[in-house]
């Protein structure tokens, strides 16, 4: 028996499996590309999934640790969404050096996010679906006193958001499009 040569039947089934997986990946990417321009609908679906998850947690009266973990993950993603990609304090140090040298420029610098909107939505959808799936198995229902988790989360939320708002005020940037002037193409 020759062990060096691959089994032709095994190779054919392996190639068929790889072809099916590649086809599924392409189909998945195709649908992701189709939903990309529809931001309002994407976020509405995420809101619906989060409501479904909260109803599931409330009705089942369990899986509070999974809910807490999802909340922390979404908070982390939201902070990355609000945070600029480049550290403002380093840029301010460079500007101070320019001021001393007399080279201050009022050049416009756009706000570039650390986490783009689509990736924020995509990561949030994946985390919510995973949390919904985990809430189907009783092994993940760890007994815990949920008011403590809620208090921890609320405290963490307020402390991190206060720090983020102070950072936004200190370096004078607005990460959201609310109140910003929108330019449109003139219609003929």
From Swiss-Prot:
The keyword Membrane applies. It holds the Pfam family Rer1. InterPro entries: Rer1 (IPR004932). It is a multi-pass membrane protein. Its main location: Golgi. It comes from the Eukaryota. It is found in: Golgi apparatus membrane. The chain crosses the membrane at residues 43-59, 62-82, 139-161. Keywords: Golgi apparatus, Membrane, Transmembrane, Transmembrane helix. GO terms for biological process: protein retention in ER lumen; retrograde vesicle-mediated transport, Golgi to endoplasmic reticulum. Belongs to the RER1 family. Involved in the retrieval of endoplasmic reticulum membrane proteins from the early Golgi compartment. Required for correct localization of SEC12, SEC71 and SEC63 in the endoplasmic reticulum. This is Protein RER1. It comes from Saccharomyces pastorianus (Lager yeast). The lineage of its organism: Eukaryota, Fungi, Dikarya, Ascomycota, Saccharomycotina.
């Amino acid at each position: 028996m020759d062990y060096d040569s691959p089994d032709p039947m095994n190779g054919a089934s392996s190639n068929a499996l790889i072809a099916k997986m590649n086809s599924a990946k392409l189909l998945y990417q195709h649908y992701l590309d189709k939903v990309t321009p529809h931001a309002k609908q994407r976020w509405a679906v995420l809101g619906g999934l989060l409501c479904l998850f909260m109803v599931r947690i409330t009705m089942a009266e369990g899986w509070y640790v999974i809910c807490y973990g999802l909340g922390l993950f979404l908070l982390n993603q939201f902070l990355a969404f609000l945070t600029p990609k480049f550290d403002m304090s380093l840029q301010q140090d460079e500007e101070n050096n320019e001021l001393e040298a007399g080279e201050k420029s009022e050049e416009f610098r756009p706000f570039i996010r650390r986490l783009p909107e689509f990736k924020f939505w995509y990561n949030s959808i994946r985390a919510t679906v995973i949390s919904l799936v985990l809430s189907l198995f009783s092994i993940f229902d760890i007994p815990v006193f949920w008011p403590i988790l809620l208090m921890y989360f609320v405290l963490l939320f307020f402390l991190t958001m206060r720090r983020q708002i102070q950072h936004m005020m200190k370096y004078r940037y607005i990460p959201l499009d609310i109140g910003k002037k929108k330019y449109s193409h003139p219609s003929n």
